């Protein structure tokens, strides 16, 4: 309509008028104006813009059933021009103009879509009248009070009383005797319905506090059913007469029987409430898995009372399978303690099980010894985050104690005390009893609240480690104590542990703090270890350990080593490293295959513990002058190494392992975990019998400023390494008259030559991928010569570049050459020409002859060495699958006669300059100057020590026959 406002005096016509005019006078109709005029007129003359959704005018003859008649209004307003030439008809330009006009008009004048459906909105309904007039409410409330609202408490109650239906409902008995009314929905008990109490009604609002009891008692059958089922579900085959908890809730209120019975229960629980604290505030003497503590009563009869503990959800699922007497209120002496004395434990260990009072905070424990203390909680205040570490599930629903006792009958297996598992048949040693076994001269250095601990191999049913049936560590009586000044501690803290591995990897974050008595002379004083848990998620309180008795074994060592004597840790299912340490004083080694391991691998390799003295794994600058196996370190952390370095043939003296400086050197390694094992056996030598183990092996992966002190004795014994790989046994013979010291030290370590053991680097389970060019190991022999390598050994990617070194220090007596075998090849009986060729086909090896030259370990590029490259390359070994690549495999050496030079082949080799990556043609890059002195076919021409380095993925079975034939050929 805005288009018609442009002319003065003209009025817009309605559509009806337009239709009438078009029918009567079609020729006199005004032509439509151009579009620009319409726009101009509308824009100029309209005072305000048109409404977008104004109501459309309904034409008078509009039919709702036929809405198409009104749709053509735009066509009526803008009809198509009549063609000028009737013969040709209308032109496309006319069509376009009319189409454009109609569209623009329809867009500017939107109209509502007419629908045949009529929606009628009714007015709001009137509010209902109140139930009673307002004047009555005012009169009842009094003139001085405000009239209460219609929804107040009093009006609602009056309305309920006045209502006949409601009054009849509450006046009738709630629980009639008729069965029809019992099945009626009105008889269902509800806590939110008003009740009659002393003739007065109570409000609708639910009241806080305890719920009201039913006024009428149900039938005796229903009461017996509910009480019997509820108690039977809690504890099977034990008759109970009380509810499982002292607190009332809606469930127990609806299922309880009567008010009189509940009163007797409450009176009964007031006496037992003292000895049953709420979960998770557990008592110190309470086992985390045993809530039905078995304790013989004074009369010897079984009493059927239940210590009604409100245990947690985990404890309800891990109830032990033992059934028997429980703590009752008739025996007041046993009240407050929950120390079980299992009959199976007494039968196995053969010790009388006396009940031990719980060790409360600030109370000195009594001097009673019992095997039944194995289920004590290791700390009085345990962080709830550590609860999952203590609840290790036992197989087939039985207790862990029964499972452990069935492992071995001759030895007492015990779990590691840092595991916090409640099942280890050990003997608690208090301060007084522990001090009684120590000479008075050594008691001054003993802490007042320390206890002897035996963190031997875990025997719990955990997926972390397997079950070990024999004691893990036995120490000679002459190598036990350490000085007081060397307060050493190990804090092996490795990488992050996943949340799903907290229970199984409880050994992965262990801080074992150790102390020892102040004595430089050898004695049988046991060491002191105080394990504490290092935080995995945040800070965790230190864990007080359970004292254990360290067994002393006097059995003579066997002359040969069997593969089954090596204890294997199976089922290494954790992805975090773990530490297993042991301190057991013993006069002699019981089993020759017992080894010491620092397990940091997930490959399930064999790990064992050697017979050695106190293992102090930690950070300390001091190194005692005693013949002990000690693990001090400068650095607080030990990084993960991607190799399995197994030191077999370790004759016990002093072992020193320092952590790496850096962990960012594992560049091409997919699995960052490894296994570092130290194995030692005590066996008689060739010429003498039962000589003491006094040789020293010092192993350090970092740097240490303190030199190693030589041990007091220099007798070396012949030893055979155990089957470290679980499949093979390698035997390396050593002349008893000669000795040398083998050590892996960092570059800046000053090491004095000490009596020795023979070192065999056993087969690695994980290969070192290519690009391992850092951490140059150096084979160092300061006594006679020094040999250095320029790059990384294929199996030893430890440390940054130029930060760690691998040195083999040996002391050469009587000018006799000994060889330390690194790799899978043994020394050859003879050599060919200018190069030492391997006897077996497909056996790559590197033999390095050490010249008489000594350099510093830090200047690795200047270190002289001689490298003999061979036909085969290390690529053939390194490119295999990971389970077949054995960069460093320990293979038994050939005969090394006593007092005779070793049959080690020498040859003049080709110098190889520069550092070579581990994935190149040679396994390790070495800076190799020329050989000082040519070595021909005679293997005995030079008396310098030689080092055979190489790898071979062959098995021992395929290798031994060929070697035996070649050896016979040499003899002929």
UniProtKB/Swiss-Prot annotation:
Gene that this sequence comes from: Pom121l2
Highest taxon of source: Eukaryota
Organism (species): Mus musculus
Family label: Belongs to the POM121 family.
Region (Disordered): 1-67, 281-302, 328-359, 406-431, 676-726, 953-972
Protein name: POM121-like protein 2
Compositional bias ranges of the Polar residues kind: 287-302, 339-352, 677-696
Taxon lineage: Eukaryota, Metazoa, Chordata, Craniata, Vertebrata
PANTHER family membership: NUCLEAR PORE COMPLEX PROTEIN NUP, POM121-LIKE PROTEIN 2
Positions with biased composition (Basic residues): 40-57
Biased composition (Low complexity): 413-431, 697-706
Pfam families the UniProt entry points to: POM121
InterPro entries per the UniProt record, alphabetical: Nucleoporin
């Amino acid at each position: 309509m805005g288009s018609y406002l442009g002319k003065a005096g003209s009025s817009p016509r309605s559509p009806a008028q337009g239709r009438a005019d078009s029918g009567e006078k079609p020729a006199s109709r005004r032509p439509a104006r151009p579009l620009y005029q319409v726009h101009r007129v509308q824009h100029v003359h309209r005072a305000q813009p048109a409404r977008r959704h104004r109501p459309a005018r309904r034409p008078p003859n509009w039919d709702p059933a036929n809405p198409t008649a009104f749709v053509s209004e735009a066509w009526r307003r803008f009809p198509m021009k009549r063609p000028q030439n009737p013969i040709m008809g209308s032109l496309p330009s006319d069509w376009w103009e009319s189409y454009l006009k109609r569209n623009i008009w329809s867009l500017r004048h939107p109209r509502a879509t007419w629908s045949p459906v009529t929606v009628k909105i009714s007015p709001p309904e009137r509010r209902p009248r109140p139930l009673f007039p307002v004047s009555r409410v005012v009169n009842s409330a009094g003139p001085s009070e405000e009239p209460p609202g219609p929804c107040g408490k009093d009006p609602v109650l009056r309305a309920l009383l006045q209502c006949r239906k409601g009054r009849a409902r509450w006046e009738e008995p709630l629980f009639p005797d008729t069965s029809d009314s019992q099945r009626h929905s009105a008889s269902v008990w509800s806590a939110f319905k008003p009740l009659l109490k002393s003739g007065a009604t109570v409000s609708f609002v639910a009241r806080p506090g305890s719920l009201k009891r039913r006024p009428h008692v149900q039938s005796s059958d229903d009461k017996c059913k509910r009480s019997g089922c509820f108690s039977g579900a809690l504890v099977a085959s034990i008759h109970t007469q009380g509810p499982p908890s002292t607190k009332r809730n809606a469930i127990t209120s609806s299922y309880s029987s009567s008010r009189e019975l509940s009163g007797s229960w409450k009176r009964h629980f007031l006496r037992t409430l003292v000895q049953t604290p709420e979960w998770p505030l557990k008592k110190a003497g309470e086992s985390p898995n045993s809530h039905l503590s078995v304790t013989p009563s004074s009369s010897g009869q079984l009493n059927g009372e239940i210590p009604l503990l409100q245990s947690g959800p985990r404890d309800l699922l891990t109830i032990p399978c033992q059934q028997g007497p429980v703590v009752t209120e008739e025996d007041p002496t046993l009240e407050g303690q929950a120390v079980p004395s299992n009959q199976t434990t007494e039968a196995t260990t053969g010790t009388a099980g006396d009940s031990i009072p719980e060790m409360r905070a600030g109370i000195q424990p009594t001097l009673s010894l019992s095997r039944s203390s194995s289920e004590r909680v290791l700390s009085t205040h345990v962080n709830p985050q550590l609860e999952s570490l203590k609840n290790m599930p036992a197989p087939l629903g039985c207790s862990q104690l029964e499972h452990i006792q069935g492992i071995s009958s001759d030895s007492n297996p015990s779990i590691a005390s840092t595991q916090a598992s409640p099942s280890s048949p050990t003997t608690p040693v208090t301060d007084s009893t522990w001090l009684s076994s120590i000479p008075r001269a050594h008691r001054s250095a003993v802490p007042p609240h320390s206890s002897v601990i035996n963190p031997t191999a875990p025997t719990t049913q955990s997926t972390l480690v397997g079950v070990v049936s024999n004691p893990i560590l036995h120490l000679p009586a002459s190598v036990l104590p350490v000085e007081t000044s060397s307060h050493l501690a190990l804090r092996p803290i490795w990488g992050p542990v996943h949340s799903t591995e907290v229970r199984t990897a409880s050994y992965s974050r262990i801080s074992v703090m150790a102390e020892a008595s102040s004595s430089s002379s050898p004695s049988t004083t046991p060491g002191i270890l105080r394990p504490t848990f290092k935080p995995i998620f945040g800070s965790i309180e230190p864990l007080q350990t359970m004292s254990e008795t360290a067994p002393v074994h006097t059995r003579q060592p066997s002359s040969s080593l069997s593969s089954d004597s090596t204890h294997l840790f199976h089922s290494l299912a954790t992805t975090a490293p773990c530490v297993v340490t042991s301190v057991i004083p013993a006069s002699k080694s019981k089993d020759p295959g017992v080894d010491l391991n620092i397990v940091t691998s997930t490959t399930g390799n064999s790990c064992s513990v050697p017979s050695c003295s106190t293992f102090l794994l930690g950070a300390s600058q001091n190194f005692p002058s005693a013949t002990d196996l000690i693990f001090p370190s400068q650095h607080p952390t030990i990084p993960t190494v991607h190799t399995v370095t197994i030191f077999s043939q370790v004759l016990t003296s002093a072992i020193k392992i320092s952590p790496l400086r850096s962990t960012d050197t594992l560049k091409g390694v997919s699995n960052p975990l490894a296994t570092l094992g130290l194995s030692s056996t005590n066996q008689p030598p060739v010429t003498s019998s039962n000589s003491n183990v006094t040789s020293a092996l010092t192993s350090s992966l970092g740097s240490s400023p303190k030199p190693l002190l030589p041990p007091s004795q220099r007798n070396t014994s012949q030893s055979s390494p155990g089957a470290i790989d679980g499949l093979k046994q390698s035997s390396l013979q050593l002349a008893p008259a000669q000795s040398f010291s083998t050590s892996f030290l960092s570059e800046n370590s000053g090491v004095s030559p000490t009596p020795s053991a023979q070192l065999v680097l056993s087969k690695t389970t994980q290969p070192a991928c290519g690009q391992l060019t850092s951490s140059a190991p150096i084979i160092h022999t300061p006594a006679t010569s020094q040999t250095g390598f320029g790059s990384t050994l294929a199996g030893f990617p430890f440390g940054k570049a130029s930060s760690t070194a691998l040195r083999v220090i040996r002391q050469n007596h009587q000018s006799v050459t000994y060889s330390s075998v690194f790799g899978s090849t043994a020394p050859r009986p003879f050599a060919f020409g200018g190069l030492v060729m391997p006897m077996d086909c497909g056996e790559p090896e590197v033999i390095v002859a050490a010249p008489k030259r000594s350099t510093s370990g830090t200047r690795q590029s200047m270190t002289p060495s001689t490298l003999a490259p061979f036909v085969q390359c290390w690529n053939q070994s390194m490119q295999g699958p990971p389970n077949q690549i054995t960069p460093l495999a320990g293979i038994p050496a050939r005969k090394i006669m006593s007092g005779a030079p070793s049959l080690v082949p020498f040859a003049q080799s080709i110098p190889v300059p520069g550092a070579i990556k581990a994935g190149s043609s040679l396994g390790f890059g070495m800076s190799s100057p020329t050989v000082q002195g040519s070595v021909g076919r005679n293997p005995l021409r030079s008396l310098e020590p030689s080092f055979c380095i190489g790898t071979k993925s062959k098995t021992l079975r395929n290798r031994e026959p060929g070697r035996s034939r070649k050896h016979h050929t040499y003899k002929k």
